[in-house]
Regions:
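Extended, solvent-exposed functional surface patches
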Residues: 1-172, 179-189, 193, 204, ...
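Short strand->helix junction
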Residues: 199-200
Length: 209
């Protein structure tokens, strides 16, 4: 590494830690804002934990946001913008993206360490239901336009690829689309998995829109 690079990296991390607020409150009562608060508080908790510092305030703030998100989870598995509202594919996709980001960065471990292994069980169950909701929405009404609150194929595949552990019901998808359209879908999946030069998987991310 170039001379001074290590010191520079340490300084940046120190700056991040010093800039941490006590906790982050959601900017609004909507699920998108709550998911952001959950994410930021657990990110802060992760930074604190790496230094051996207390994280309970951050974890409690994150779980407060989780509780409000769960209140907006519907029987069909999707999340509405607010509690009592109809499920939205866009809102649900954002929740799934952010949860996957926390999982990938191993920030969910902070919650388990602080509150116990079962602390996120309810949210884990809601996430699995949300993935199945995304499947049902996309294959239940594939002609529903994006502007009507649905998501594009690329956005669906981006989110779905984060949850390969949730079984995909190929038979149901084939039945919903028909043989011809399902074959087209498979071609699109292949094109997504093997992007052309200059393209990236993240091009379909909901949060990048």
């Amino acid at each position: 590494a170039p001379a001074g690079a290590e010191c520079s990296a340490v300084s940046v991390m120190d700056m991040l830690r010093e800039a941490l607020p006590l906790t982050v409150e959601a900017k609004g009562k909507d699920v998108i804002s709550q998911s952001e608060a959950m994410y930021v508080n657990l990110l802060a908790a992760g930074l604190q934990s790496s230094e051996g510092k207390p994280v309970r305030e951050y974890v409690d703030a994150a779980m407060k946001a989780v509780a409000k998100m769960l209140a907006a989870a519907n029987d069909d598995g999707g999340f509405g913008w607010f509690e009592g509202m109809k499920s939205s594919p866009i809102v649900t996709a954002v929740v799934l993206e952010r949860f996957a980001g926390l999982r990938e960065r191993k920030l969910l471990n902070v919650v388990s360490d602080e509150l116990g292994e079962d602390a996120l069980d309810a949210f884990d169950d809601a996430v699995v239901s949300a993935v199945r909701y995304m499947d049902s929405v996309y294959f239940g009404d594939p002609d529903r336009p994006v502007w009507y609150g649905c998501i594009s194929l690329w956005q669906y595949l981006n989110v779905r690829s984060m949850y390969v552990g949730v079984p995909f019901d190929e038979a149901a998808a084939r039945k919903a689309l028909g043989a011809k359209n399902y074959n087209e879908f498979k071609k699109a999946v292949k094109a997504y998995l093997v992007p052309k030069k200059g393209e990236r998987w993240s091009d379909g991310a909901i949060l990048s829109k």
